[in-house]
């Protein structure tokens, strides 16, 4: 491949890019493939095809193809962004495994003698949350959707007395935790429903019957005391019989 020389045209393209306001929003799940297409313009009319990639929080880069000389200029090396095919056949852009760092805006500009044609994408990366749960005390259950993007929504069946909190992370993901309590003793099982753009999950949770009280603790203490008393009696009895045997001899 040959490289196109850097020209002030790149600065002009980025300037135009910043003022383009019509976006096509594309949501892609992390780890899957993304393919972005240019405008449907016959390549026989194209003079220059340029992709301007502007990831959020990262420097911009370009992928350009000059039709007449078949020269390319690519400054996106190491970002897992490539042509979907050879640009002289299909000038689509491809990301083989989408990651959070690919989120941002992508502009395809096709330059023709009749003018320039643009298509802009706002690539949004979806991250499925890791869903877990655990039982708390006194007929309480906790359901957690960790590191999802966007934030997951948690609901319960049947309804209980619930408190939901969210924690945002530096990479844009969000952890949502819902803690729910049920007073009714007749509720023995509940369901935690986690709703997310990548798919919904439902977890069935068995609750302990009855509310937690001091009775089990008292029974435990009584049981421990009885065991200790039994051990003491055994030791006393063993010492008594041992002493008796010594006296006989």
From Swiss-Prot:
Source domain of life is Eukaryota
Write down the species.
Mus musculus
Q: Name one GO cellular component term.
A: external side of plasma membrane
* Chief site of localization: membrane
Q: Which cell locations does it reside in? A: Membrane
- Check the record and name the Pfam families matching this protein: C2-set_2, V-set
Its name, as the record gives it, is Cell surface glycoprotein CD200 receptor 2
Q: Which ranges carry the Ig-like V-type domain?
A: 25-124
């Amino acid at each position: 491949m040959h490289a196109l020389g850097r020209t002030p045209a790149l600065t002009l393209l980025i300037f135009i890019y910043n003022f383009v306001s019509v976006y096509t929003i594309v949501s892609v799940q992390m780890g899957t493939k993304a393919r972005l297409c240019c405008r449907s313009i016959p390549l026989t009319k194209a003079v220059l095809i340029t992709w301007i990639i502007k990831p959020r929080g990262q420097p911009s880069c370009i992928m350009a193809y000059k039709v007449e000389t078949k020269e390319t200029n690519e400054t996106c090396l190491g970002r897992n962004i490539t042509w979907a095919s050879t640009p002289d056949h299909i000038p689509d852009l491809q990301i083989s495994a989408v990651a959070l760092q690919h989120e941002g805006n992508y502009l395809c500009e096709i330059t023709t003698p009749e003018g320039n044609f643009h298509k802009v994408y706002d690539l949004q990366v979806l991250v499925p949350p890791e869903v877990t749960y655990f039982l708390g005390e006194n007929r309480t259950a906790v359901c957690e959707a960790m590191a999802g993007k966007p934030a997951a929504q948690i609901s319960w069946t049947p309804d209980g007395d619930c408190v939901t909190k969210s924690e945002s992370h530096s990479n844009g993901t969000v952890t949502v935790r819902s803690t729910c309590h049920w007073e009714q003793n007749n509720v023995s099982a509940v369901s935690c429903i986690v709703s997310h753009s990548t798919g919904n999950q439902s977890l069935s949770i068995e609750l302990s019957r009855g509310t937690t009280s001091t009775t089990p603790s008292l029974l435990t203490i009584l049981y421990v005391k009885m065991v200790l008393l039994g051990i003491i009696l055994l030791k006393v009895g063993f010492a008594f019989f041992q002493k008796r045997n010594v006296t006989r001899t």
